[in-house]
């Protein structure tokens, strides 16, 4: 009980910021953040409408194998021998 928790320190820090920085600057900062979020949402909506108007129909071709990859045979067991062979 003798020490203060993190919540106590955060409240003290908020009070000190309001006293020294002033409430007007904080409200201006919050307004700037709100305008930034609105701008971000608007641009995301514009991007979605641009993608819809490209005429591709929303279909994306499945990717092919990457360059340098090796296709394995389904009967390969990983031991160096085909899975159907028996060892003498």
Curated annotation (Swiss-Prot):
Give the UniProt family note: Belongs to the TatA/E family.
According to its UniProt entry, the function of this protein is described as: Part of the twin-arginine translocation (Tat) system that transports large folded proteins containing a characteristic twin-arginine motif in their signal peptide across membranes. TatA could form the protein-conducting channel of the Tat system.
Which NCBIfam families does this UniProt record tie to the protein?
A: PRK00720.1 (NF001940), tatAE (TIGR01411)
Compartments it resides in:
Cell inner membrane
Q: How does it assemble?
A: The Tat system comprises two distinct complexes: a TatABC complex, containing multiple copies of TatA, TatB and TatC subunits, and a separate TatA complex, containing only TatA subunits. Substrates initially bind to the TatABC complex, which probably triggers association of the separate TatA complex to form the active translocon.
- Extract the ranges annotated as region (Disordered): 45-88
Q: Show the stretches that span the lipid bilayer.
A: 4-24
Annotated GO biological process? protein transport by the Tat complex
* Keyword vocabulary terms for this entry: Cell inner membrane, Cell membrane, Membrane, Protein transport, Translocation, Transmembrane, Transmembrane helix, Transport
Q: How does it sit in the membrane?
A: Single-pass membrane protein
Gene Ontology cellular-component terms for this entry are: TAT protein transport complex
Protein name, entry field: Sec-independent protein translocase protein TatA
Under the heading InterPro entries, the entry gives: TatA/B/E, TatA/E
- Low complexity bias: where? 75-88
Pfam families from the entry?
Answer: TatA_B_E
What GO MF terms are annotated?
protein transmembrane transporter activity
Coiled coil stretches, renumbered:
none
